[in-house]
Design a protein with these regions (language model features):
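Gly/Ser/Thr-rich loops at beta-strand to alpha-helix junctions
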Residues: 51-58, 80-81, 108-119, 134-135, ...
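Long, charge-dense
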Residues: 126-172
């Protein structure tokens, strides 16, 4: 997801300030047929702890069905990538807390590089695995190659997903109203309107709302919401079929080097400025 200027400003609010940011409660849960998830042929899924962004909460619930090997799951609020240092500190602290566990073989991160917020993470006792992804959009599309191809074909697209829709964190009328309420806690009316206008100018760089889903219960109302936002903005609308394979294999394996980066204790995750997106390094280099 692209960083929002408004969200960067809101990050400057005092930590104890209530933003009263509304959620878009038009995405009810519905019954969906859960997939028959299983590990790769001939293998068993490794016992893992899962650290995940809550933007993927319903997708993970769907594709972890039957996953007794996932011993512990922790979800963190979406939008932490607006402050990459805070995301890194939060995840590193969670890794430290998982050190005491003797019943896991690895920690899986349902994140991408996320504004380099996961760069410099260091596993302490258990190896760490993360998909080779710029952000959650790569996870929805199923591969870094598909992400790169779509970015090339539609550089002016803005991505909508069920999770981002639920939190009103995508361009649209409810995002404007939620931002106005939050900014009013910190700034006077003139400054609020200036910041909102700056946000609208950022949105003007885009002309297409691209909606992605992985078959969760809120997929259809989420698509309708994205279409309504596109109409309000005067944008085109497209819906792409998501590919759950990257998320499924993060949860179940296999973790091949082409799609996943494994970081062993004594290593750290760093950004790679090529198609790999990320690599490992030691403190020596």
């Amino acid at each position: 997801m692209r960083l929002s200027l408004i969200d960067l400003w809101l990050d400057r609010l005092p930590q104890n300030a209530s933003t009263n940011e509304a959620t878009c409660d038009r995405f009810p849960l519905a019954n969906v047929m859960k997939p028959e998830n299983k590990p790769d042929e001939g293998g068993r899924a490794p016992r893992i702890a899962l650290l995940a962004c809550s933007v993927l909460e319903r997708e993970i619930a769907l594709y972890r069905n039957g996953a007794d090997h996932i011993i512990e799951t922790r979800f963190f609020e979406m939008g932490l990538h607006d402050n990459p240092d805070h995301l890194r500190t939060t995840l590193q602290a969670a890794l430290g807390e998982l050190d005491v566990r003797n019943d896991i073989e690895a920690v899986a991160l349902a994140y991408g590089l996320c504004g380099r917020g996961t760069a410099e993470l260091r596993p302490l006792r258990h190896r760490l695995v993360i998909p080779r992804a710029h952000d959650c959009i790569t996870i929805f599309l199923g591969s870094k190659e598909r992400y790169a191809a779509h970015q090339k074909a539609c550089p002016s697209c803005y991505y909508y997903t069920p999770g981002w829709n639920r939190e009103c964190r995508v361009p649209g009328p409810e995002k404007i109203e939620a931002s106005r309420k939050s900014l009013a806690l910190k700034f006077d009316e003139e400054d609020v309107e200036y910041l909102l206008e700056t946000e609208r100018e950022q949105w003007a760089m885009h002309d297409t709302a691209t909606y992605l889903d992985l078959g969760t219960s809120d997929a259809e109302p989420g698509a309708e919401y994205a279409k309504q936002c596109a109409d309000w903005l005067g944008w085109k609308f497209e819906r792409l079929k998501g590919d759950p394979s990257l998320l499924h294999d993060l949860l179940w394996g296999p973790w091949d080097a082409e799609r996943f980066q494994i970081i062993e204790p004594g290593q750290r995750l760093v950004h790679s400025p090529d198609e790999r997106i990320m690599r490992v390094a030691t403190d020596a280099g």
